[in-house]
């Protein structure tokens, strides 16, 4: 029951995060279009209904493949690769991925500020009158 609740509650945030990562992939190895294409094509391949969206967007955005067959402890997991035509990841892709995440956070903050400005502005004006 807890896992289903998690799936429901994270349905929109996972897709929003994937979209933000895709937008933030400008200038990264794969770019925005590849991030969106990979996200839409490969995210549903993930065993989780939500985890694949940001992971696939990052794979496309960086131009690398992620996921695929792997081993967890003694258990072998057989899974499709995200962005299967992408190159192998290199050490520099960790820093590039972190930059993409940072840009995604800035985009989200800007969107929240813009969306919230009509509500914030009157408070800011009153604050300025009180302390200005």
Residue ranges and their predicted role:
Residues 1-132:
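Hydrophobic alpha-helical transmembrane segments
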